[in-house]
Design a protein with these regions (language model features):
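N-terminal secretory signal peptides that target proteins for export/translocation
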Residues: 1-16
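C-terminal motif of bacterial Sec signal peptides marking the signal peptidase cleavage site
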Residues: 32-35
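Bacterial signal peptide processing site
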Residues: 37-39
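Extracellular mucin-like PTS domains
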Residues: 43-57
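Short glycine-enriched nucleophile-adjacent loop
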Residues: 69, 207-216
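Active-site catalytic motif of lipid deacylating hydrolases and related acyltransferases
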Residues: 71-74, 100-104, 110-195, 358-411
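Surface cap/lid and interfacial helix-loop subdomains adjacent to catalytic sites
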Residues: 178-193, 213-376, 381, 389, ...
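Gly/Ala-rich beta-loop-alpha elbow adjacent to hydrolase catalytic centers
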Residues: 200-208
């Protein structure tokens, strides 16, 4: 597959792909800004760490990198209270205490999805509440097993998506150059040779694909440091029926026998994606932002986080209470609890499916009698599937995968 700059989308592709995302993120931004949260969020107090909305000296290092998350950072959104209320299908509740973490000898490098709400095409590096909310929702629970590093980058903003995908594809180059500078700072000054876990979603996955292609895939010394890469909602591709090749030449997909040094990639849908889906089908949608234009001979990768070896498995679904990001996608409202996290066991199962040129993680409700827990829906329509919930639907599984990958890496 080509490793060139992102292809320019046609006007029709851009019109279909981005306006819904813009509207949704602007709604979420309004919720964050006005403090409009669910009853659960209002009852949870302030136990989860929150970042300020301005850049401070403690966040900016000598190289100019602004860290959304890093070890020792005051008000670190990736290292808060992880105590959790478990709510079963019958409504029974139990509270899990914040797990005590041991010494962390691995680093996690996290790139957040589209969140910036500036009016420019590319964001500045000021930390906003939307980026903080994403970091808490997606990356914080990994801090049990690794030191989470999350740089701010000059991502394409919500309002800039349409322009970036039609008349200004160079905006993605600006974003990637920013990520590359952050990575160079991290690997030169902070990693100190420790093993690395990569985590990305949506635009973060676009950037992570390009970073791994240019810096890791063909560099054995760095490749051997990678424990596992989680690339959700990004359309990693492989040759049809294969586990290596395509997006990455030397890095395989994870499997039952390959638990480290590999990639976990998927996009979640409740059923088969439509022919014009933005995810799960090669050569279209988000694939175009990484220059992956091939439509034949390849398939979008699907690795089930709950069953790396394949098959159907229950999902370990975790939702942050205080961030409003998942709230617009769930009904009825989440139950009021006193912990910053909710865990819904045995609510969904997942299976990787492949049919008619599409590959996807099919997420299906267990459907227990009397289950009144909030359910996810396709808030942006069938072409997006469960994209906005990709990480949280599988979060407990992904954290366990990282833990198992670290064990395999050691051994």
């Amino acid at each position: 597959m080509p490793h060139n700059q992102p292809a320019t989308l046609s006007t029709s592709q851009s019109v279909r792909l981005w306006p819904v995302l813009s509207i949704l993120v602007l709604v979420v931004t309004a919720l964050v800004g006005t403090g409009c949260q669910s009853d659960a969020a209002q009852s949870a107090g302030t136990s989860a760490a929150k970042s300020t909305t301005t850049t401070t000296a403690s966040q900016t290092d000598a190289a100019g990198t602004v860290w959304l998350c890093r070890p020792g950072l005051a008000q670190n959104p990736c290292d808060g209270d992880m105590s959790t209320t478990t709510v079963t299908a019958s409504g029974q509740r139990t509270v899990q205490a914040d797990p005590v973490g041991g010494e962390k000898t691995y680093n996690c490098f996290y790139l957040y999805p589209t969140a910036s709400n500036e009016s420019t095409v590319n964001s500045d590096l000021t930390v906003q509440s939307t980026e903080t909310a994403d970091a808490t929702a997606q990356a914080a629970r990994f801090s049990r097993y690794c030191n989470v590093w999350a740089p701010m980058y000059k991502q394409v903003t919500v309002s800039g998506l349409g322009q970036a995908n039609t008349t200004d594809p160079g905006a993605y180059t600006v974003a990637y150059d920013s990520v590359l500078a952050d990575w160079t700072d991290f690997i030169s000054n902070y990693d100190k040779g420790l093993p690395i876990v990569f985590i990305g979603h949506s635009q973060g996955s676009i950037m992570l694909i390009k970073l791994i292609q240019s810096q890791i895939d063909n560099t054995p010394a760095l490749r051997k440091l990678v424990v596992v890469s989680i690339i959700a909602g990004g359309n990693v591709v492989v040759p049809t029926g294969q586990t290596v090749g395509g997006t990455f030449r030397n890095i395989p997909l994870c499997s039952a026998t390959q638990r480290s040094g590999c990639v976990i990639a998927y996009s979640s849908f409740p059923s088969q994606p439509p022919a014009d889906a933005n995810f799960g089908i090669p050569g279209q949608g988000i694939s175009l932002n990484t220059g992956q234009t091939a439509t034949t001979g390849v398939q979008v990768a699907c690795v089930n986080p709950a069953a790396l070896g394949g098959g159907t498995a229950d999902l370990e679904t975790y939702w942050p209470v205080e961030t409003p990001l998942p709230i617009p996608s769930m009904a009825p409202p989440a139950p009021a609890v006193t912990t910053p996290w909710l865990y819904y066991p045995r609510q969904y199962t997942a299976t990787c499916e492949s049919r008619d040129g599409a590959s996807w993680l099919q997420v299906v409700p267990v459907g227990a009698t009397g289950d009144t827990r909030p359910v996810v829906n396709e808030i942006a329509g069938p072409t997006w599937g469960y994209h906005f919930q990709d990480i949280n639907l599988t979060l407990g599984d992904l954290v366990a995968d990282v833990h198992h990958a670290e064990s395999a890496f050691k051994g």
